[in-house]
Every structure is written in structure tokens, then in C-alpha cells.
């Protein structure tokens, strides 16, 4: 089940990390012969790098799925600069509408006549949790499922009602209803 997260703004974390980097540079310059001050500078510098690792940019119509050592934490769907736990791993998932140009399939219709059928399918990810965790490759999954649906559609209806006079909906005349 998808869980939407609202992370904090990344601008404050970016400001804090820049201040830490500047202060660590000051400590490096000020503590030329003082190993304790130089060590503090290193600690501040690596703390700033750790904070920067938690920054993420999400573009419009994209999302990030967050994991914490293999456990699903949530999904961020808002766009902008955000700060999350630096130990989270993230997976990008596009929420944009995508086109799938199905290849032309040779199948038999309901009456047993050979026909050639194809489809152009527009789809987009609705649930990022299912897209990432319930299938291996969701783009390949959509392609295979759409081909199976087109095959099922072709064998469920007659192409034309010349042989089946009782057919109300055909693939040729009832395209909108099919």
C-alpha cells in the first residue's frame, strides 16, 4: 500500500550544510598546528557531506520511492528540493503519461477468421508501491499485459457481422464500445 510522505524543505538543510562547510574551512585555516581544531574541521566537513546526501530534487510528474535498508518507508510525489534521512535509498518513478506502441498481432476473431490487430496504449503509474515492489519491471509488465488484453479482445468479438448476424458489437463497427 502506497504511503505518501511530506519531507521537509531542502533549502534549510542546504543552508546548514553550506555553513558547516564554510566553518570547517575556517577551522582548517585557523588551526594550522592544532590537530584538535583540524579534526573538528574534518568532522564538520563530513557532517555537511552527510546532510547533502539527504537532499533530493524531484521534478514535476515524478516521484521517489524511499527505502530504509530494504524496508519501504514511503513515496514523495511533490516536486521541489527536499531533505530526507541520508540513509534512505531512493528509486525514481515517472508519473507522466507514457505511450506504448503495441506490435501488430495476428490472431483469430470470435468466428475463427484470421485478423491483424494492434493498439496504442496510453498509461501512467497510479501506485508507486505496486510499480516498484509487486513486479520486477513495471514497463515490461505493462507491455506484456497490454498484448494479452488485445489478444483477449480480438477473440472475444467478431471482426464483422457478416457471418454472425446476431452480433451487436463487432471489432470493425463497435470500436468505441469495445
Q: In which residue ranges do the predicted regions lie?
A:
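Hydrophobic alpha-helical transmembrane segments
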Residues: 26-45
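Membrane-cytosol interface motif
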Residues: 63-88
